[in-house]
């Protein structure tokens, strides 16, 4: 199969003209072992001699879908996909040339994006391991009919490119070991629950900020203040060390696959933006809009992960919980966007927690309930406080929404992570217990006889351990609006 990686001239708009030579070719995101999104109109594109006729014939219906190569040498045709199944073949013809795709499946496609916690493979990072890795790798080959992987590794680009140098892969132990743990476990859960194949496009870059995943235009329309914009522009000075410059990852990894038929996005990012608690929600909202516009779906599902607790070199610091509250705010302002909480899945000594399966399972459960409308019997919406009652006896009573069953601590140990402050605004560790109704928590501290504020899990790391009886963690919260 003839392929080509083609750089686009500056100023070319996404989805518009893309100039290059006349050689007949197909974008790399279409290859043998791929998954087409089921029951939709899926675009297929490539390049060829202007004026030539290109015909795509999928074996699931035998129909011919034809188009003419544009003057700029690009072509695109939409193919109707059927219900889940396979393997199928797809023939792409142009004159006497033919590209044959084999072992093609119809099912669900999700695009997995973010930084290192999304990138972290089943095999782990050095001494940082993934729980369940051995079992996943050993059993990978048995899932060839259920899971397929397209792993993007394109370097950052200063201008948009038209194609990527990657190919779809059928799972083996080696493929599984190199694949995003979050992506793999998500696909495994979703495929088993839906009974259909699942393809994942893994597109993650360790250490990346959110800005490289956006165009400069998307950043401009995020509604940032002058100071916030100045801070973003200042990081370009460090672009040689980290992928931080706006648009670089968009150019090299998102633009080339934009429009590929998929159900939705997974996003696990934030560590590199953790000190932007005042504007990250605006950036994420604008990024989601950019992606949805590029895919032509105004409410394409967007599922993302709240940052887990970690020392960050200052375990008593509060940058992380402030940032998590900003992440939570973005879910409220963005339609068809849902966050999952990882507050009890963190690790004090590593920024890459090992419990990737639990996070992926929560993403899958949220997708099943909110995207596919399937009740799995485990509510995954995280509990949030609905009211605070500061009693005269010094006890603070916190009532929660979205509990669904009972609040409890991990392994029924003493609840940790609460703090109280009095008029001096100095926070002290507090005791807490769940009331008989399972949805109310009483908090007290001998050092704070007259509390005026209560916080939970409001440190970078404090060993907080409260969750529902279904194992859904409670995210950081606070009753005050103080600056720190």
Task: Please identify what each model-predicted range represents.
Residues 22-484:
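Cell-envelope and extracellular/periplasmic
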Residues 7-17:
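Bacterial N-terminal signal peptides
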Residues 1-5:
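Positively charged n-region of N-terminal signal peptides that target proteins for export
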């Amino acid at each position: 199969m003839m392929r080509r990686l083609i750089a686009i001239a500056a100023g070319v708009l996404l989805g518009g003209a893309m100039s290059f030579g006349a050689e007949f070719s197909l974008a790399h995101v279409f290859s043998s072992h791929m998954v087409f999104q089921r029951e939709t109109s899926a675009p297929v594109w490539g390049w060829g001699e202007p004026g030539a006729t290109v015909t795509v014939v999928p074996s699931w219906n035998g129909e011919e879908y034809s188009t003419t190569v544009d003057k700029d040498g690009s072509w695109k045709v939409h193919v109707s996909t059927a219900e889940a199944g396979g393997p199928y073949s797809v023939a792409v013809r142009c004159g006497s040339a033919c590209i044959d795709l084999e072992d093609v499946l119809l099912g669900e496609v999700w695009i997995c994006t973010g930084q290192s916690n999304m990138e972290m493979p089943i095999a782990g990072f050095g001494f940082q391991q993934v729980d369940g890795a051995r079992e996943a790798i050993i059993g990978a080959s048995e899932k060839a009919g259920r899971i397929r992987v397209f792993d993007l590794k394109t370097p950052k680009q200063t201008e948009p490119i038209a194609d990527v140098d990657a190919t779809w892969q059928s799972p083996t132990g080696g493929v599984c070991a190199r694949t995003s743990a979050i992506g793999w476990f998500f696909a495994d859960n979703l495929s088993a629950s839906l009974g259909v194949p699942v393809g994942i496009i893994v597109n993650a870059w360790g250490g990346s900020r959110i800005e490289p995943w956006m165009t400069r235009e998307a950043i401009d329309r995020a509604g940032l203040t002058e100071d916030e914009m100045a801070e973003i522009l200042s990081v370009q000075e460090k672009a040689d060390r980290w992928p931080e410059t706006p648009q670089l990852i968009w150019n090299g990894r998102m633009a080339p696959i934009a429009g590929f038929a998929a159900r939705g996005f997974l996003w696990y990012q934030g560590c590199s933006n953790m000190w932007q608690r005042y504007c990250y929600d605006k950036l994420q909202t604008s990024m989601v809009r950019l992606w949805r516009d590029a895919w032509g779906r105004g409410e394409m599902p967007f599922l993302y992960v709240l940052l887990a607790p970690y020392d960050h070199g200052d375990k008593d610091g509060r940058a992380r919980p402030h940032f998590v509250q900003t992440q939570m705010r973005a879910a409220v302002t963005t339609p068809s966007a849902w966050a999952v909480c990882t507050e009890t899945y963190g690790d004090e000594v590593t920024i890459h927690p090992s419990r990737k399966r639990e996070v992926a399972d929560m993403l899958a459960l949220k997708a099943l309930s909110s995207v596919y409308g399937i009740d799995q019997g485990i509510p995954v919406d995280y509990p949030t406080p609905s009211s605070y009652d500061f009693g005269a006896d010094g006890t603070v009573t916190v009532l929660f929404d979205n509990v669904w069953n009972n609040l409890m601590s991990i392994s029924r140990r003493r609840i940790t992570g609460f703090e109280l402050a009095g008029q001096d605004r100095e926070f002290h560790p507090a005791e807490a217990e769940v009331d008989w109704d399972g949805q109310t928590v009483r908090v007290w501290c001998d050092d704070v006889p007259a509390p005026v504020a209560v916080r939970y899990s409001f440190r970078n790391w404090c060993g907080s351990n409260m969750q529902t009886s279904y194992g859904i963690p409670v995210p950081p919260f606070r009753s005050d609006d103080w600056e720190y």
